[in-house]
Amino acid sequence: MRFMGSPVISARNVWKIFGKDPVGYLKTLQPGRSFDDIRADGYIAGVRDVSLDVARGEMLVIMGLSGSGKSTLVRCFSRLHEITGGSIEVDGQIIGDLSEKDLIELRRNKMGMVFQSFGLLPHRTVLDNVAFPLEMRGQDRHTRRKRALEVIELVGLAGREDYFPRELSGGQQQRVGIARSLAIEPDIWFLDEPFSALDPLIRREMQDEFLRLQAMLGKTIVFITHDFDEALRLADRIAIMKDGAVEQCDTPDQIVMNPTTGYVAKFTEEIDKARVVHAGVLARAGVVGEGQPVEAGATVQQLARLLVNDSRDLIPVADKGQVIGALDRQGALDILLKAS
């Protein structure tokens, strides 16, 4: 999917260093110093020289192992952490220049946040938990109740408005957390490993629910996970982090097919590429195929029967009815056979 227009979030050369005098240290830091070099100097580089954009309506998944800097980076995006160097713009505003009042307004009106710990108020019902941020805004009881009921229905909890958190399953509690963050109708949605505490079946269910909501709402989303399969399933683009730096930021197809570092390649070794790679990525522009085209959005796995039974060497690929090129059937078969 291609996203047009100005980015909603734009980070340039962002650093977040922890230590005694991080600003002074960064001023004297020599180019090329590694994470371990910085640690040897008595500092921790939570984020190292990160530059990336998040487009409107895009779901950017930030992935990495524990300690890679993914949560620190997202906290910089919302200015829960003050950055040590560089700049971050949100909707065209340099957030480091905002007053405390303006920053609070930005968070209240444009940003929704969901974390691994649900953070529900145990003495409040589902309805009152979801309405809580609207109450903090000062909205009247009727207005906030109406909005809370809308998002409770949206996340599939209609009929449980009067339940208390202790009466809900883990997946249902996380749905309440998602509904609460949606109640303020945020433009930007930050989710920090929201499903990692759930068992695998509920986690898959919540991923399905999340994709359904995103298809309906089209939010700008920054989603953190340490699970590569989850990243591949949800992302428009994936940024893989290590030691505070972004190793590669690209579409799931490109990361699986063309990892740019050995570190990224390790994540892709056990991945069933046929499940991830789409015909549109394999299509060679300007190459002419014969016969009925396949859809650009179809994965190699979805095309398995055709690839095995078809006799064409070059198969046309169409995106929204327009032929964009042709894929080499043997190349696609190689991907399919390696997955089997």
UniProtKB/Swiss-Prot annotation:
It is a peripheral membrane protein. It comes from Ruegeria pomeroyi (strain ATCC 700808 / DSM 15171 / DSS-3) (Silicibacter pomeroyi). Its EC number is 7.6.2.9. This is Trimethylamine N-oxide transport system ATP-binding protein TmoW. GO terms for cellular component: plasma membrane. The keyword Cell membrane applies. GO terms for molecular function: ABC-type quaternary ammonium compound transporting activity; ATP binding; ATP hydrolysis activity. Disruption phenotype: The double mutant tmoXW shows significant reduced growth on TMAO as a sole nitrogen source. Growth on trimethylamine (TMA), glycine betaine (GBT), choline and carnitine is unaffected. Part of the ABC transporter complex TmoXWV involved in trimethylamine N-oxide (TMAO) import. Responsible for energy coupling to the transport system. Is specific for TMAO and essential for TMAO metabolism. It is found in: Cell inner membrane.
